Amino acid sequence: MLISQRPTLSEETVADNRSRFVIEPLEPGFGYTLGNSLRRTLLSSIPGAAVTSIRIDGVLHEFTTVPGVKEDVTDIILNLKSLVVSSEEDEPVTMYLRKQGPGEVTAGDIVPPAGVTVHNPEMHIATLNDKGKLEVELVVERGRGYVPAVQNKASGAEIGRIPVDSIYSPVLKVTYKVEATRVEQRTDFDKLILDVETKNSITPRDALASAGKTLVELFGLARELNVEAEGIEIGPSPAEADHIASFALPIDDLDLTVRSYNCLKREGVHTVGELVARTESDLLDIRNFGQKSIDEVKIKLHQLGLSLKDSPATFDPSEVAGYDAATGTWNSDAGYDLEDNQDYAETEQL
């Protein structure tokens, strides 16, 4: 099996809603393969929300005007196409806009229901004079890509319901380039630089994560043809490599107390890897292995960046009685009550 060095992904924030991602090192040729796939997916397949139709009080079609409103209906529709919204609902939802003149009508005047957010409230919609009044009902739906107004026209829709072009994609622009990068003596590896700009409804980071998830799902179809087929395997990250090395350590290197060490040895636990595969409950089932020994093991593993199988990631050694955070040492005799017939000085040998 061929093992490739695991690439790293870094993010640089260029501006609000714009980030530059760097993925390196990639096997020769994979920069363009990955860059093109991510770009096309980001631009076409990231889910979003948009206005699909509107109804303006007193208006029967888009080729008309509203009394007291500077903009005609066509201009109002064009402005509403730039509305940036997000919706948590899978079904269509309705928003309402009611404004009395004089003054400017903005997206901030729209009243969205729960689960729907307007992300550009400063956006201009219309201008009203002293006698102007604007009442609009807007339908918002979730989707992806671009859907023209003709496809949003529902059969049997009421008179006055005007379909709108829907731009669901929350991604505005994606560019990428591939540069050469060096790995040891080789200089033909690829470095992919991906520039992503989004609307306010999603961050570039979340958009890229969504694109990656979509591609994994689709490429998984090909993998399912033969899950045993040979391919290039990505090597572990530096942190994972450190953990792999730690798993091979004998428990002798943990410098455990004699009691804890002997209990684990009797149970057949000889390496750190075998130890982290156990839960606290598993260890408590070992004869003479109590809470004090559990705390000791958790502290020793924490110093290696590891934990027991069911230990929470928020484990704090300083909360354990007898632990000195300044020196990283633990007093095994502090803060524990002895149980009946229990001697912590026991030095039972195998």
Curated annotation (Swiss-Prot):
Residues 326-350 are annotated as: Disordered. Residues 241-350 are annotated as: Alpha C-terminal domain (alpha-CTD). GO terms for biological process: DNA-templated transcription. InterPro entries: DNA-dir_RNA_pol_insert, DNA-dir_RNA_pol_RpoA/D/Rpb3, DNA-dir_RpoA, RBP11-like, RNAP_asu_C, RNApol_insert_sf. The keyword Transcription applies. It catalyses: RNA(n) + a ribonucleoside 5'-triphosphate = RNA(n+1) + diphosphate. Disulfide bonds: none annotated. Keywords: DNA-directed RNA polymerase, Nucleotidyltransferase, Transcription, Transferase. It is an enzyme of class 2 (transferase). Signal peptide: none annotated. GO terms for cellular component: cytoplasm; DNA-directed RNA polymerase complex. DNA-dependent RNA polymerase catalyzes the transcription of DNA into RNA using the four ribonucleoside triphosphates as substrates. The N-terminal domain is essential for RNAP assembly and basal transcription, whereas the C-terminal domain is involved in interaction with transcriptional regulators and with upstream promoter elements. Homodimer. The RNAP catalytic core consists of 2 alpha, 1 beta, 1 beta' and 1 omega subunit. When a sigma factor is associated with the core the holoenzyme is formed, which can initiate transcription. This is DNA-directed RNA polymerase subunit alpha. The gene is rpoA.
